[in-house]
Amino acid sequence: MENEAKIKVFLVDDDAVFLKSLEIEFIHHTDYIVETFATGELCIANLDKKPDVIILDYQLDGIDKNAMNGIQTLDQIKQFNADIPVIMLSSQDKIEVAVSCMHHKAFDYVVKSETSFLRLQKAITAFFNFEKIEKELNWYMSRMS
């Protein structure tokens, strides 16, 4: 498959061990192009590489307490391009945190666990299936006009 057709995923997490393990899972079990970033600032600086989806940690304060948190990073990503799907990832399983992420236009919210990779993979698949159906619907609607 050509690189042009491959899905490009940005992984953003300040937990180096978790980030590396997630990167390895994606490289071994998918055909995605994977880029990793330890801070929201680095992710924002690389948005010109046009990621297809971003997996973003909610906290992001493990390296630098003054660094942007996940919500601030999410807001800047959406300012750059509102169409980039962002899946929030967190060790917090509080419903308020998930709702807050969705209010900031996250596509999904996944709690960090031993099944995170599978949930993330399903969320990415769901997004691209939804996008395909939406394009088909728009095509049919344009034919009816």
Positions of predicted regions on the chain:
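Conserved phosphotransfer cores of two-component systems
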Residues: L47-K49, Q76-D83, H104
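Non-catalytic signal-transmission and effector/linker regions of two-component phosphorelay proteins
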Residues: M1-F10, D15-E23, I133-S145
